[in-house]
């Protein structure tokens, strides 16, 4: 685990974005941890979040021309990541996002920001069922652009309805790489460093045994 990944876990814990306990997910599964990126909700949170996304992007080595944030959660993520890339990595890249509802006046279409072209890096909070990615792919392809990769904050590394995860499905269906700031494996490595969290470590490991990929 790299230092920025450890810092991201501590940041998420401090904001209660990441919690350990017992939570029922939308899928009905009982999970020993919960991640709610919506709680990164102040200016400082967003500034820090952008730095972590930018760090993971640069670390990945994936080449891309533009950041795309799917509405709605992806919009602030794309914006803050673009700022962080410019301020901390000297990479001044365009960004773009979509509207959920098409405008009938003013600037046309359902896209805001730079023209959607070239190699696109899609940024979002998490991938649960992959629906937002599929909708975004339609927009990207309709504009003649290509998907360079997808970056999310957390990869839960767990099976969907079948034997593979929603993330593995996206990688298979769109022949692209999905990267994340942290994974379930990183969470477990972090818990292993904290003796006072042994109870949570056991629960998360048991969950991975049952649902992990």
Curated annotation (Swiss-Prot):
Gene Ontology terms describing biological process: 'de novo' pyrimidine nucleobase biosynthetic process; 'de novo' UMP biosynthetic process; pyrimidine ribonucleoside biosynthetic process
One cellular-component annotation, GO: cytoplasm
Protein's UniProt name: Orotate phosphoribosyltransferase
Residues that, per the record, bind orotate: 34-35, 128, 156
Binding-site list for 5-phospho-alpha-D-ribose 1-diphosphate: 26, 72-73, 99-100, 103, 105, 124-132
Cross-referenced InterPro entries: OPRT (IPR023031), Or_phspho_trans_dom (IPR004467), PRibTrfase_dom (IPR000836), PRTase-like (IPR029057)
Gene: pyrE
Protein role: Catalyzes the transfer of a ribosyl phosphate group from 5-phosphoribose 1-diphosphate to orotate, leading to the formation of orotidine monophosphate (OMP).
GO molecular function: magnesium ion binding; orotate phosphoribosyltransferase activity
HAMAP family in UniProt: PyrE
Pathway entry: Pyrimidine metabolism; UMP biosynthesis via de novo pathway; UMP from orotate: step 1/2
Taxonomic lineage: Bacteria, Pseudomonadati, Pseudomonadota, Gammaproteobacteria, Enterobacterales
Domain of life, per lineage: Bacteria
Alphabetic keyword roster: Glycosyltransferase, Magnesium, Pyrimidine biosynthesis, Transferase
């Amino acid at each position: 685990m790299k230092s920025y990944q450890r810092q991201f876990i501590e940041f998420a814990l401090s904001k209660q974005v990441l919690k350990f306990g017992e939570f029922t997910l939308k899928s009905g599964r009982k999970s020993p941890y919960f991640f709610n990126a919506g709680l990164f909700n102040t200016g400082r949170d967003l500034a820090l979040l952008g730095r972590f996304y930018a760090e993971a992007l640069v670390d990945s080595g994936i080449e891309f021309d533009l950041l795309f944030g799917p509405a709605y959660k992806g919009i602030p993520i794309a914006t803050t990541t673009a700022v962080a890339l410019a301020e901390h990595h000297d990479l001044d890249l365009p960004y773009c996002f979509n509207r959920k509802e098409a405008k009938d006046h003013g600037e046309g279409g359902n896209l805001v920001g730079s023209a959607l072209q070239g190699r696109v890096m899609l940024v979002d909070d998490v991938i649960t069922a992959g629906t937002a990615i599929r909708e975004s792919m339609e927009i990207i392809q309709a504009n003649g652009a290509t998907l360079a990769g997808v970056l999310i904050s957390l990869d839960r590394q767990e099976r969907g309805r079948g034997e593979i995860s929603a993330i593995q499905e996206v990688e298979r269906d769109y022949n692209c790489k999905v990267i994340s700031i942290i994974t379930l494996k990183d969470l477990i490595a972090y818990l292993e460093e904290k003796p006072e969290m042994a109870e949570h470590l056991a629960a998360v490991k048991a969950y991975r045994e049952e649902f992990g990929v």
